[in-house]
Amino acid sequence: AEYAFIAFPIKNAEAVNKGEKPVTELGVKAVDDLTLEVELEQAVPYFLNLVAFPSYYPLNEKFVTEKGDKFGLESDTTVYNGPFVLTDWKHEQGWKLKKNDQYWDKKTVKLDEINYSVVKEVATRVNLYDTNAIDFALLSGEFVDKYRNNKEEFGTYSQVSTYFLRMNQKRGGQDTPLKSQKLREAIALSIDKKNLSNVILNDGSKPADFLVPKGLATGPDGKDFQETFKNGIKPDAKKAAAAWEEAKKELGKDQVTIELLNYDTGNAKKVGEYVKDQIEKNLKGVTVNIKLQPFKQKLKLETEQDYDLSYAGWGPDYADPMTFLDMFQSNHSHNQMSFADPKYDDMIKKAGGELMGDAKKRWEELGKAEKLLLEQDVALVPLYQRGDAYVQKPNAKGIVHHNISPEYSFKWAYMTEKDGK
């Protein structure tokens, strides 16, 4: 399974996953009907964060076995134990959440039903909001100014997720132009991220030279990871042009065409066009062709490494820098760009192993690893830390926003009458 790695802190989990040990040797046992005992490979300071991640959720074995390959693919082949159950799931169109009468704390849940609509075009979304067809809508930058002064309905929040350009070094068994470290560096230097965040996105997003987002985690000294390390390459058009001159020598050519894989949604299209413009303007001789794909197909092409550049993002699975840094190890299932640096692998291995008992040294090692990844290897190009701008009807109350895992909790949500009663 692609996400098996998240269970590897458990004793023998990696060996069981590889088929090297039987599942009976996994470090988990049921002490009684309500208690699990978990043995770890070593102390993991963020383990309780991990067990709140969906990959750790318990499953009803009888139900899963009965549904087989169809488990989780439809609303009626999924089992629920939260405040709501999923119904009327029409793929790519929408779904409903209905109050779960079996939920242990159902008396707290005030809403009977929540209706989701999948609306890719923001203009359509805004029209639905303005005509009172929906109560909540995420906005893209061009609609922010329309609502910004409406204090009752408009808001923004910062996510602890980072968006970046993957730079694939091998495609179809052949090296891509991005195998050139100097070309990767030139691209990293060529993109004005402030303009991207403040003008193109205009939704509360912030420019990022870093991978590990601000607000994710603090070190032993109580300081934010980015406040301590301040890693990353700052954009500079002159330095970009100079790095491109060096890249030409590495590549043995003056012109390069690269493909940018992108989502087919409105905001992503704008970012893709901006990135293309910045690279082509600042690196004369580099041509960027954009390939738009639906979400699922884009992920498939990334997994198959059938791309050159890819506009991608990552949100945390748990509150530790490792959730961003470990996926660029050479053997990680989410590397997906043939990046490999034994020194980086060793740093991540140490931070996830022998240094677990020394918080200060572990923190320093993670900071050095991010610096190596972004400034020396230039494995990827951070673009921005995501912000979300939204409008919400004043009578929609009690929606809780989370930075990690599910974005919203509706357990405490309720609707008042539109006159405020």
Predicted regions and their residues:
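Gly/Pro-rich hinge or "lid" segments in bacterial periplasmic/extracellular proteins
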Residues: 11-25, 31-34, 40-109, 113
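Structural transition elements
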Residues: 207-246, 267-269, 357
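Ligand-site clamp/hinge motif
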Residues: 102-146
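Ligand-binding "clamshell"
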Residues: 145-158, 306, 320-335, 393-397
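Long beta-strand-rich cores associated with HINT superfamily self-processing modules
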Residues: 390-421
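Extracytoplasmic/peripheral linker and loop segments enriched in polar/acidic and small residues
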Residues: 19-24, 28, 285-298, 325-393, ...
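Alpha-helical secondary-structure segments
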Residues: 33-37, 82-83, 111-113, 161-210, ...
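Ligand/substrate-recognition segments at binding pockets and active sites
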Residues: 91, 245-316, 388
